[in-house]
Swiss-Prot record:
Family (UniProt): Belongs to the bacterial ribosomal protein bL27 family.
Coiled coil residues, start to end: none
Keyword check for Translocase: no
Gene Ontology MF, one: structural constituent of ribosome
Lineage top rank: taxon: Bacteria
Entry's Gene Ontology BP terms: translation
Pfam families associated with the record: Ribosomal_L27
HAMAP family listed in its UniProt record: Ribosomal_bL27
Listed transmembrane segments: none
Name of this protein: Large ribosomal subunit protein bL27
InterPro entries: Ribosomal_bL27 (IPR001684), Ribosomal_bL27_CS (IPR018261)
Keywords linked to the UniProt accession: Ribonucleoprotein, Ribosomal protein
């Protein structure tokens, strides 16, 4: 008679890949048109001036400029991109 136990099986051992969400370009950073600013699920950040929104809620720059994070009302946050010349006027 064999003296080895059967090894059995497990139902664990799986994990999904990370989605790599989050802010990709921060406030004050220079960006070019097409740069991804925020990868998100849902609209944690809303699109502001010169920012487009993809079908998966990704925010991206529509023009070359500088990124700014702003408040939109009490609880909403929005991301805008201002052209370099206009960004200096907004900052001051």
């Amino acid at each position: 008679m064999a003296h080895k136990k059967g090894t059995g099986s497990t139902r664990n051992g799986r994990d999904s890949n990370a989605q790599r969400l989050g802010v990709k370009r921060f406030g004050g950073q220079a960006v070019i048109a097409g740069n991804i600013l925020v990868r998100q699920r849902g609209t944690k950040f809303h699109a502001g001036n010169n920012v487009g929104i993809g079908k998966d809620d990704t925010l991206f720059a529509l023009v070359d400029g500088v990124v700014t994070f702003e408040r939109k009302g009490k609880s909403r946050k929005k991301v805008s991109v201002y052209p370099a010349a206009a960004a200096e006027a907004v900052a001051s």
